[in-house]
Amino acid sequence: MAKDIITGRKTVFGNKRSKALNSVRRSWKPNLQKVRILVDGKPKRVWVSARALKSGKVKRA
C-alpha cells in the first residue's frame, strides 16, 4: 500500500452506511502521484499526495 512520504497520508478504512444503517466495509484512498523530488540533495522518485504538491510542501526535482 502506497503512502505519502511528506504528510504520511495513506488508505483509510471505514464503513459505508445505508439509509437502513446496513454497513459495508470501504476505503478512502488519497490522490497519490509518483514524482521526482530532492531527498538529501539527490533526486528520488517517491509517492507524494496531490494536496502536498498543491500546497507547496514539496518541490519537484
Curated annotation (Swiss-Prot):
Transmembrane segments: none
Molecular function in Gene Ontology: structural constituent of ribosome
Species for this entry: Lactobacillus gasseri (strain ATCC 33323 / DSM 20243 / BCRC 14619 / CIP 102991 / JCM 1131 / KCTC 3163 / NCIMB 11718 / NCTC 13722 / AM63)
Any single biological process term in GO: translation
Family to which this protein belongs: Belongs to the bacterial ribosomal protein bL28 family.
GO cellular component, one term: ribonucleoprotein complex
Gene3D superfamilies: Ribosomal protein L28/L24
Entry keyword set: Ribonucleoprotein, Ribosomal protein
UniProt-listed InterPro entries: Bacterial_rp_bL28, Ribosomal_bL28, Ribosomal_bL28/bL31-like_sf, Ribosomal_bL28_bact-type, Ribosomal_bL28_sf
Superkingdom of the organism of origin: Bacteria
Name of the featured protein: Large ribosomal subunit protein bL28
One Pfam family of this chain: Ribosomal_L28
Disulfide bonds: none
Record bears the keyword Ribosomal protein: yes
